[in-house]
Amino acid sequence: ALSLAMQTSYENGLYQFAYMQYHMLFMTAIYFVLLKLYVLHHNEMEQALYYLLKDRYNEFFGKENTKDGQLYFGSFAAIGESDVFKLLHIVGMDTNLEGELKKLVKERNDYAHANGRLLLTSEEFFLEKIRNFNHCIDRVFALIKHDILQLYASTLNDPDFYDPDIRAYLDPVQQIQEEIVKKYSLSRFELNWCRKFNIKQLESSENYASKKELHIALSKYYKELKSEI
């Protein structure tokens, strides 16, 4: 819905609104990355959150900031936007990227100020801002690429995932959708990495045919997603 609202604003020349909406989409992508880090680097994230939040730590994990007692992507919105980026140091974010991310937040705040001194009325200027967002999110996703590929490889090698006799869903596409895409909130970026995984390196492993079938199903699912854009 937010993506559609942004597109509508852009097509109607409402670049200021489109810019604000794109920033929200950008932060949502950041929150999903952080949620993945909470799963993949759980102990480090717990420690980082404790030091970052201090006396607000328990509140962060409280009922009002979780769903069914679990963190979800929106939980991270409870942390100030400039502060939440610090959690990316867990996967090697450098100070240059942190500075660029904080700059995006500062610019958004400047454009959102009620005095209206800064107005984004040019399509060219709007597209320049979007390129800045996209450049930064590409750098953020690059930080987790290795982790995602490791996750995919270990998942493919898990009998509970690949074995058709015991896995949750017999249909390979449904198994991919439910047990990896939804479970780990994988984006198109990450699915694209996974579909390029060299499945032949598992050729000598047990039940290779089932693993290959699931890998093909993931590639098919990715192509269907891409065709819908």
Task: Name what the model sees in each region.
Residues D68-G74, G92, V173-Q175:
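A broad, low-specificity signal for short, low-complexity segments enriched in glycine/proline
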Residues L2, L101, S205:
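A contiguous, well-structured "functional interface" segment within a domain
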